[in-house]
Amino acid sequence: MIQIKNAKELDGMRKANALSAAALKYGGEHIEAGMTTWELDKLIYDFIVKHGGIPNFKGLYGFPGTACISLNDTVIHGIPSHDIVIRPGDIVSIDTGAKIDGFNGDNACTYAVGKVDLEAQRLLDVTKAALYKGIEAAKAGNRIGDIGYAVQSYCEDAGFSVVREFVGHGTGKELHEDPEVPNYGHQGRGPRLVPGMTIAIEPMICQYDCKINQSKDGWTVKTKDGGLAAHFEHSNAILKAHTEIMTRFWDDPDFDTEKFSLK
């Protein structure tokens, strides 16, 4: 059942997503070649807790980390590890969120570590642009299928492929709520978007084929053909006159994580 948020609940969602976005940007700013994904996860954990939040990924369905940290051919759900070292030329996806006052934030970004090859950079650029194409379609009166169509058509026109098994979702007092928000679909189909809905739009895009494999750890999802994958995500509030990107801070070059405060 889709939960429609009132004004007070939307304010709670804004707060949780502001911290989530600040934590994500902080993590991205501190990625360094030579560090482990466990070390990166710890930095994000400390940032969230320092600002009064609860890392809402940690323990969810048994996931052990504060963030899903996924390198190169790992699409999503990479488990932070002492054994995974970030190298120059890697692409690193961070997917994380924070819970405050009973409300959940959720966002993701894929970062280049130093200089990456041209095709890897193009994958990042297209996937990020597709996120904003999806958000442009996510306006009151449209339908969920309009979002998926916008993402899918943009990525496939660029020669990339869209993961089918994992999708975006509603957010709120639960991290994952209805409706599902696929990154593929047909215009004019699916639930109608109405003011008060809060949804996470998150393109998961593959360099080559979209077929995936889940690792034996039960979490890590990789491309079957070993190609690269990228993942970007914003949590959004559907309002009457516009759609608000509640996690916009992670993509704001002027946002200073060192000065961030919820007070």
Task: List the model feature ranges, each with a label.
Residues 1-263:
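Active-site neighborhoods and metal-handling regions in enzymes and metal-associated proteins
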